[in-house]
A protein has these predicted regions:
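Conserved catalytic cysteine-centered active-site region
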Residues: 34-55, 82-136, 141, 266-295
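Flexible, glycine-rich active-site loops centered on histidine and acidic residues
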Residues: 129-163
């Protein structure tokens, strides 16, 4: 008999350095008005040399563990969704496992670009639902600033660095992860990619690639058209799987790519402004981290209060997209803790 699953914790790991649009004006031809009007982004966090992918993931993990007030030693599985690991191996998940003190946890990384956290959540739910594991730590983390051309105003203005985490646990009562939905279309792989970072690089193993050869590349118009169709499709399909109506969803927590995509998708779903969870203005596009970071902040600011039906929906390179509808009932067991204090 399938076991129900619920989310019992959420956490964040955010770099300390804030880069505002005014800061970007100093070295590229842009302005705060130009960036904000097109993306909704006002500032983003950028990782220092010491703030690695694993370091941010560890911060998010510890924050989620504190939220749920569980012992790290009780975690059975750690899944890290990232496109920007510290190294090809060992996995970031193994580094997290050692740092938080979870010696019995299995650990692996998963790569599905900005949709990675949704894929990881779905995989974690399957392990819990099958009875294989009871407690699963899922982390989305990316440091895209290492792969940006800081002279290209079409890409460098969009991204920030960060990590967000969820803790799933077997549910004694009803299943609170109501449905998940995953999709991919590899014919669009060329629309958003970071080249020359793997074995396809012609001189892999002999000559390191030049920095210019491994910058993130994106067809912004094509990604916009893809996203504004993919998000409503995923939300409707996931709601149907969950046996609810779109109108029954209390909050939409979308991938924080940019404000235009979020607003266009919300309009197609006939959702009100107050139903949309967004922090893209403060953190930019943090890739696999953006959904848990947005929900984490909305909970801290009391926009989302339990119980609430939330639809988490992501899209990104691959192309990949997907959604999860969850009933959020967890409360921060630290009381009125503020992670920014």
């Amino acid at each position: 008999m399938p076991v129900g699953a619920k989310l019992i914790g959420v956490g964040a790991g955010i770099p300390s350095a804030v880069v505002t649009n005014a800061d970007l004006e100093k070295f590229i031809e842009t302005s705060d008005e130009w960036i904000a009007s097109r993306t909704g982004i006002r500032e983003r966090r950028i990782a220092s040399e010491e703030e690695t992918t694993s370091a941010l993931a560890i911060l998010a993990a510890k924050d989620a563990i504190a939220f749920a007030q569980i012992e790290p030693s009780t975690i059975d599985l750690i899944i890290v969704a990232t496109s920007t690991p510290d190294n090809l191996y060992p996995s970031t998940a193994c580094m997290v496992q050692a740092a938080i003190g979870a010696p019995r946890a299995a650990a692996f990384d998963l790569e599905a670009a900005c949709t990675g956290i949704i894929y990881a959540l779905a995989v974690g739910q399957q392990f819990v639902g099958s009875g294989t594991f009871k407690t699963v730590l899922v982390i989305g983390v990316d440091i895209h600033s290492r792969f940006l051309n800081w002279e290209d105003r079409n890409t460098c203005i969009l991204f920030g660095d960060g990590a967000g985490a969820f803790i799933l646990q077997a549910a004694d009562g009803e299943n609170e992860i109501l449905a998940t939905y995953l999709r991919a279309d590899g014919t669009g792989a060329h629309l958003l990619h970071i080249p020359n970072t793997g074995t396809a690089y012609p001189h892999a193993g002999t000559t390191p690639p030049k920095a210019m050869d491994r910058f993130l590349q994106m067809n912004g118009r094509a990604i916009y058209e893809f996203a504004v169709h993919a998000v409503p499709e995923a939300v409707r399909a996931t709601a149907a799987k969950a046996g609810i109506r779109v109108e029954d969803i209390d909050f939409l927590v979308p991938h924080q790519a940019n404000r235009r995509i979020i607003n266009a998708a919300a309009e197609r779903l006939n959702m009100r402004k107050e139903q949309i969870v967004s922090n893209v203005d403060e953190l930019g596009n943090t890739s696999a981290a953006s959904i848990p970071l947005a929900l984490w902040q909305a909970i801290r600011r009391k926009q989302v209060q339990p119980p609430a039906i939330c639809c988490l929906v992501g899209f990104g390179g691959g192309l990949t997209w997907g959604a999860a509808i969850v009933k959020w009932t967890a409360k921060d067991k630290r009381g009125d803790y503020n992670a920014e204090d």
